[in-house]
Amino acid sequence: MGKRAAHIGLRALADLATPMAVRVAATLRVADHIAAGHRTAAEIASAAGAHADSLDRLLRHLVAVGLFTRDGQGVYGLTEFGEQLRDDHAAGKRKWLDMNSAVGRGDLGFVELAHSIRTGQPAYPVRYGTSFWEDLGSDPVLSASFDTLMSHHLELDYTGIAAKYDWAALGHVVDVGGGSGGLLSALLTAHEDLSGTVLDLQGPASAAHRRFLDTGLSGRAQVVVGSFFDPLPAGAGGYVLSAVLHDWDDLSAVAILRRCAEAAGSGGVVLVIEAVAGDEHAGTGMDLRMLTYFGGKERSLAELGELAAQAGLAVRAAHPISYVSIVEMTAL
């Protein structure tokens, strides 16, 4: 590769124009407006509440990268690639990029990544003046968007999670920080002899309650409003932490595991479900995202074992399932 080619390649790799243009288009729902028949820059701008000339410039760039088409009369259309920006597309990607959603907003914290690298602290408070969790706690709409996105993300693994482990043998499980109840619903549907509880804060707990009523699972599914930093309902066969620990620094992660260990006692099991660093699916980009959002991290099995030991637990087994693993822990 020549010097100029290498220079252009590095610039392209670091360029912010395209990622931000895509996110702005997602936030303004440009693809939906085009699909609805608004085809010129002026029409799309009117529907989206945008400045027509500026939007036209953004659209021209997204034509250049293959998301949209533009004919000689300035009429825009969607490419197959650009269809993914529609809100109703099966991939569900638009909401992740929408800068008004919890994740789209959180990703903008990458602008402050240097702070995280220098200090080891999350970048989110530097950008927004408050922590990610405090932000969600003060904004029900933002909180609901986070719960929806997380549920959609984990649904890809629900079938494998339900099939890969002998959940029925546990009798009753507590999904700690279980959000709107998607995982527990999948487990109860797959295992008719299993019952369970979702424990989470008021917003997601209310959503879980509605889900269980709607799906006819309320006879076997309970909801408890609470925090995983406080004592948990004791005596269940299993305590599930699905995509929880990577959101927290080591001290907080140990505190969460310790609460689970206390509730599980000598006869229960703690099941950590998340990507394990070192696996092919544990992305380095996601690891940086955990750092910038929360000061959290993607951990290796050895690192999870170290945290478990501090909480009075030991890793007994790990069951890989597509993009995540079920890491089984019991009392030392």
From Swiss-Prot:
**Enzyme Commission number, as recorded:** 2.1.1.303
**Variation of activity with pH:** Optimum pH is 6.0.
Tell me which residues this entry annotates as catalytic.
246 (proton acceptor)
Molecular function terms, GO-annotated: O-methyltransferase activity; protein dimerization activity
Identify the pathway.
Answer: Antibiotic biosynthesis
Q: Give the catalysed reaction(s), semicolon-separated.
A: 2,7-dihydroxy-5-methyl-1-naphthoate + S-adenosyl-L-methionine = 2-hydroxy-7-methoxy-5-methyl-1-naphthoate + S-adenosyl-L-homocysteine + H(+)
Q: Which UniProt keywords apply?
A: Antibiotic biosynthesis, Methyltransferase, S-adenosyl-L-methionine, Transferase
Q: Which residues bind S-adenosyl-L-methionine?
A: 133, 153, 175-179, 200, 227-228, 242-243
Q: What class of enzyme is it?
A: transferase
**Residue positions binding substrate:** 11, 247
Q: Which residues form the signal peptide?
A: none
> GO terms for biological process?
antibiotic biosynthetic process; methylation
Reported function: S-adenosyl-L-methionine-dependent O-methyltransferase that catalyzes regiospecific methylation at the 7-hydroxy group of 2,7-dihydroxy-5-methyl-1-naphthoate in the biosynthesis of the naphthoate moiety of the neocarzinostatin chromophore. Also recognizes other dihydroxynaphthoate as substrates and catalyzes their regiospecific O-methylation. The carboxylate and its ortho-hydroxy groups of the substrate appear to be crucial for NcsB1 substrate recognition and binding, and O-methylation takes place only at the free hydroxy group of these dihydroxynaphthoic acids.
Of which family is this protein a member? Belongs to the class I-like SAM-binding methyltransferase superfamily. Cation-independent O-methyltransferase family.
Q: What is this protein called?
A: 2,7-dihydroxy-5-methyl-1-naphthoate 7-O-methyltransferase
Specify the taxonomic lineage. Answer: Bacteria, Bacillati, Actinomycetota, Actinomycetes, Kitasatosporales
Q: What gene is this protein a product of?
A: ncsB1
